Amino acid sequence: QLLTAEQTGWDWFSLHLNDGRKLMAYRLRGGGEDGGDYLFTHLMDARGTTQQRGTDGVVLTPLEIQRVARRDIPTTWQLTLPDAGLDLTIEARHPNRWMPTTVPYWEGDVTVRDTATQEALGVGYLEMTGYEVND
């Protein structure tokens, strides 16, 4: 795996919102400040103007964990970017997408909804690594 000794994996999101915005978010688990996670987002508006954000105000939380290939995989997430007015629920369309390659990972398409209203806001892609077998 292409990680430091302190990092256990990553969760990477590429989201295309219906209003034309595009959002990339990733979390490196471990290795951040005080041993915590490192979270980064990059938001592009419909005109192509970008804003980079670190961890300030951004919250990424697993909402649902499913058992996939003997691993506990987060298949539904909440991503909140208060400065951008976004509170998103991101859900895997096909949870059983574990790839048992040399660097094992989960990848698949996701749907994006407004957390409060459940209105469909877009689609995207999610890739996750570092989820170990947990018998």
Regions from the language model: what does each represent?
Residues Q1-D135:
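Structured soluble/peripheral alpha/beta segments that form catalytic or ligand/cofactor-binding pockets
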